[in-house]
């Protein structure tokens, strides 16, 4: 591997930084709706009274609020499934740039919903920003993976998740009643998303297009070479160009890859299964359930302002994403994912014990707080960041957009299902709901151990070749045989 491949140049930092502004938007819009729930519900009631001369029924209010929250995921499902329509036609960078129009429209709708006395404007704004975020979850990991050198691909790929958790943390802080989570400023809280959108519109024109897109999709070798020189900070980019040309030759031998082809072809069936299961391991891990439980647990523990403790968990969230950023290229993706899943399973068991004994032993609430922080920390070590960028690593240039669309759709759909069903399952199971997540985490651990290869330090073509060599027979190999061509046996 060339020394230049480990260099973090200014142009590379600008490109990745410009892209992850979209990740920040995703995180912010995920977390922003929770804090101002009561004041927005009051706005819904006032609007209803203004229109119909009577207070809104509690059931209608609950339905409207649930729709306001869930419509974001519906938009995300549609957006994530549409990734391939844009990236191959307009390019990776230009697609990110164009999508900011959705953020501006959403900001206007939500920002003026109170003035217009229209909760429909708010709900439509949530849907539109959901579409934007669904597209972002495909665009950002793809672009970052394609501009990054092999030696830095995992670390820079983790920045997508870091952007998400920082966005959530900002939303939690801005959502405090003393800042913007009050009856006067909540429209600004929801519409402030125009600022990162505007910033991205300013930054992205100075960022290069993906060199892989230029060479492999557009056959513009000179432009790709020029971009690579700027990204790598060196005049000698022969190694990168040769790798891309080899991938391009391989792509020309393959027919156009559709979403159905991903599941039909033996060469793609294994990696798409891995991609989907890793996305499910993120959303079905119970992380959303933990955040759901956290406020009530902090209250039972005697925390005077549970919202500040929730922000504390957001800080833990961010801190351990940074830890993952620094160790992912040393420890490897597979190892960190396994550690994260195992740690989360242990914390889920602790949480179940603590919640079950909370009434008899009040001090158990402190154990549950430790379990919450531990659960969040282990999530950000593996299942949080890794599923996002490993999907881009598992596929060559041809099938990558379709694969990212399928993986993103799986993530958003499972997110939607958990959001809609968790409260009913929790009412049925009580504190024992975490037993369900423990079982799922163990199953995901087993799958990861036997099926997921290590991609650390390997080029896209080497990873794809590993799957092609195995073909349909890979599932019959031992973990050692499966991981060998992909470098899992290399020294940490």
UniProtKB/Swiss-Prot annotation:
Q: What is the effect of changing residue 223 to Q?
A: In EIG12; uncertain significance; no effect on glucose transport; impaired phosphorylation by PKC
Mutagenesis or variant effect for residue 77 to T: In EIG12; decreased glucose transport
Recorded consequence of changing residue 243 to V: In EIG12; decreased glucose transport
Q: What is the recorded post-translational modification?
A: Phosphorylation at Ser-226 by PKC promotes glucose uptake by increasing cell membrane localization.
Q: What is the effect of changing residue 295 to M?
A: In GLUT1DS1; 75% of wild-type glucose uptake activity
Q: How does it sit in the membrane?
A: Multi-pass membrane protein
TM ranges are 12-33, 67-87, 91-112, 121-144, 156-176, 186-206, 272-293, 307-328, 335-355, 366-388, 402-422, 430-450
GO annotation (BP), single: cellular hyperosmotic response
Ribonucleoprotein recorded as keyword: no
Q: Where does cytochalasin B bind?
A: 137, 282, 388, 411
User: So which tissues is this one expressed in?
Assistant: Detected in erythrocytes (at protein level). Expressed at variable levels in many human tissues.
Keyword Protein transport among record annotations: no
Q: What does this protein do?
A: Facilitative glucose transporter, which is responsible for constitutive or basal glucose uptake. Has a very broad substrate specificity; can transport a wide range of aldoses including both pentoses and hexoses. Most important energy carrier of the brain: present at the blood-brain barrier and assures the energy-independent, facilitative transport of glucose into the brain. In association with BSG and NXNL1, promotes retinal cone survival by increasing glucose uptake into photoreceptors. Required for mesendoderm differentiation.
Name of the featured protein: Solute carrier family 2, facilitated glucose transporter member 1
Which species is this UniProt entry from? Homo sapiens
């Amino acid at each position: 591997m060339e020394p230049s491949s480990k260099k973090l140049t200014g142009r590379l930092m600008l490109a990745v930084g410009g892209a992850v502004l979209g990740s920040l938007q995703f995180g912010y819009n995920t977390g922003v709706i929770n804090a101002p729930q009561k004041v927005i519900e009051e706005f819904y009631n006032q609007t209803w009274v203004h229109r119909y001369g009577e207070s809104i029924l509690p059931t209608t209010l609950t339905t409207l609020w649930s729709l306001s929250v869930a419509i974001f995921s519906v938009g995300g499902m549609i957006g994530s499934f549409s990734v391939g329509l844009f990236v191959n036609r307009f390019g990776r960078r230009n697609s990110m740039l164009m999508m900011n129009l959705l953020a501006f429209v959403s900001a206007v709708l939500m920002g003026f919903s109170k003035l217009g006395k229209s909760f429909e404007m708010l709900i439509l704004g949530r849907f539109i920003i959901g579409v934007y975020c669904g597209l972002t979850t495909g665009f950002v990991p793809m672009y970052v993976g394609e501009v990054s050198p092999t030696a830095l691909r995992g670390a820079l790929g983790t920045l997508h998740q870091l952007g998400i958790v920082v966005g959530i943390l900002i939303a939690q802080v801005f959502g405090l009643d003393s800042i913007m989570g009050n009856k006067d400023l909540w429209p600004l809280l929801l519409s402030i998303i125009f600022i990162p959108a505007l910033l991205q519109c300013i930054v992205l024109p100075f960022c290069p297009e993906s060199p892989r897109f230029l060479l492999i999709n557009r056959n513009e070798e000179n432009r790709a070479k020029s971009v690579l020189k700027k990204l790598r900070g060196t005049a000698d980019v022969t190694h990168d160009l040769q790798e891309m040309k080899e991938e391009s030759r391989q792509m020309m031998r393959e027919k156009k890859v559709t979403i159905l082809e991903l599941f039909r072809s033996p060469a793609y069936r294994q990696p798409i299964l891995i991609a989907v299961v890793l996305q499910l391991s993120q959303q079905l891990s119970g992380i959303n359930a933990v955040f759901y439980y956290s406020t009530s647990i902090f209250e039972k523990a005697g925390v005077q302002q549970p919202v500040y403790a929730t922000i504390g968990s957001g800080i833990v969230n961010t801190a351990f994403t940074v830890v993952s950023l620094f160790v992912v290229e040393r420890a490897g993706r597979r190892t960190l994912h396994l550690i994260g899943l195992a740690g989360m399973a242990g914390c889920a068991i602790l949480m179940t014990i603590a919640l079950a004994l909370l009434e008899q032993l009040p001090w158990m609430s402190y154990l549950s707080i430790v379990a919450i922080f531990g659960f969040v920390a282990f999530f950000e070590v593996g299942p949080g960041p890794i599923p996002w960028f490993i999907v881009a690593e598992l596929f060559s240039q041809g099938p990558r957009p379709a694969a990212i669309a399928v993986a993103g759709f799986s993530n958003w759909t499972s997110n939607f299902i958990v959001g809609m069903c968790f409260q009913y399952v929790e009412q049925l199971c009580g504190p024992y709901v975490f037993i369900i997540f423990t079982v799922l985490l163990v199953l995901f651990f087993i799958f990861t151990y036997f099926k997921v290869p290590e991609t650390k330090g390997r080029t896209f073509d080497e990873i794809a070749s590993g799957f092609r060599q195995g073909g349909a027979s890979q599932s019959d190999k031992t973990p050692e045989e499966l991981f060998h061509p992909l470098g899992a046996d290399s020294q940490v």
